[in-house]
Amino acid sequence: IDLNTGRVVYEQDADERVYPASLTKVMTLLLAVEAVERGDVHLDDTVTAYADCNADMVEGASNADIKVGETMTFEDFLYCAMISSANEACNVVAEYVCGSISAFVERMNTRAQELGCTGTHFANPHGLPKDDHYTTAHDLYRITKEALSHELFATICNTVKHTVPATNLSEERTLSNTNGLINPDSPMYRGYYYEYAKGVKTGHTDAAGYCLISTAEKDGVRLLCIVLGGKGTARANGTTDFGSFSDTLTAYRWVFSHYGWRAIVSASDLICEVPVRYGRDGDSVTVRPAQTVSAVLPAADSDGAPQFEQQVTLY
């Protein structure tokens, strides 16, 4: 999707309901950031991991090894949740923001409706599988677009590494972003670094497959790409190709090589001459655009043909 205009460049099954895995955390962080902006909570608040923060975890679920009773700042819990994809951190954040996980999940669903989502229902703040926890690519775009409009959200999801100071129960730890597009040392997804990429979030469960929301910008063209249900395919060298990343890179490289900013009309273009009756200084006025109007469009043909048709309406 072209982030400058909201124009869909390519889509496939964008309204199919699927499990989002940890892409859920985009909504979780959005609600946390909005709570900070309202002044309901503060980044430097001291927050304690409550007794049941690990209660709904499953074996192998991503975590930041947060211990019950451990205290750190609210900001550090946000970094744990987003760049380390720590599920227990999401529970702590939800409890702190809304008083209970159930109240937070209710707020997630309300916010999704406010953003125009029609195929989404959340059942938890982290994305571990539940039958009634689903979304669509279109809805994830709506949620992510709103989230990226908040500076704090954009900063956190684009952070490659973050250091959490020593706590009452743990030594200092360095969190490493799971997104291999922006972190060449990603704990899971190496070999996909892309210089034009920025956050947003990785996700994986057996039910959801490999999922990725990301953005990239080149020559003023800003794109958002969402891949859901990617496969993990063994390579001959013993490594794994993760479809969420390889498909994303294929999409970015294709769009950036075939699309670009094109001037629809230029401020110097003469649109027409409009007759003026009884004019003091002439019998017509020249109509030109107040400014150049551009859009992201397919590149011109080799002969320079514009590949689009201009239609100008005078009011």
Regions found by a protein language model. Give the residues of each.
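Domain-terminus/edge residues, biased toward the C-terminal soluble/receptor-binding domains
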Residues: 117-118, 132-134, 138-315
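Active-site-adjacent loops and short helices of periplasmic peptidoglycan-processing enzymes
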Residues: 1-138, 142-151
